[in-house]
């Protein structure tokens, strides 16, 4: 605990909050172009082939983003919308691709949580 004199001499440092998604540059989403679409394996206790894409954003950053849902139509040069949100078992993946926006199609045959996967209401 500092004394009053110590506080007069040197004031307290302000705590700076570090962004969890710096590549979005204070925007809710960013548009980008897929440069590589591939699968990768998760960290130790889990086992799968997770679908990810390397995306060059309009902000100039190149990020790895996760493609959620079953099946996708993305390939190189696809235009996608990227939002924040990390994948806990994939190191370095801090972004999600928004399904149902731009070139990323919605998940077909989805009946629950449709809004998260860009699926229209079934007739």
Curated annotation (Swiss-Prot):
The keyword Transit peptide does not apply. Keywords: Methylation, Ribonucleoprotein, Ribosomal protein, RNA-binding, rRNA-binding, tRNA-binding. Gene3D superfamilies: Nucleic acid-binding proteins (2.40.50.140). Disulfide bonds: none annotated. GO terms for cellular component: small ribosomal subunit. CDD domains: Ribosomal_S12 (cd03368). Residues 1-24 are annotated as: Disordered. GO terms for biological process: translation. One of its GO terms (molecular function) is tRNA binding. PROSITE patterns: RIBOSOMAL_S12. Residues 10-20 have a biased composition (Basic residues). The modification 3-methylthioaspartic acid is found at residue 89. Coiled coil: none annotated. It comes from the Bacteria. Pfam families: Ribosom_S12_S23. Belongs to the universal ribosomal protein uS12 family. Part of the 30S ribosomal subunit. Contacts proteins S8 and S17. May interact with IF1 in the 30S initiation complex. With S4 and S5 plays an important role in translational accuracy. Interacts with and stabilizes bases of the 16S rRNA that are involved in tRNA selection in the A site and with the mRNA backbone. Located at the interface of the 30S and 50S subunits, it traverses the body of the 30S subunit contacting proteins on the other side and probably holding the rRNA structure together. The combined cluster of proteins S8, S12 and S17 appears to hold together the shoulder and platform of the 30S subunit. NCBIfam families: rpsL_bact. HAMAP family: Ribosomal_uS12_B. This is Small ribosomal subunit protein uS12. It comes from Sulfurovum sp. (strain NBC37-1). The gene is rpsL.
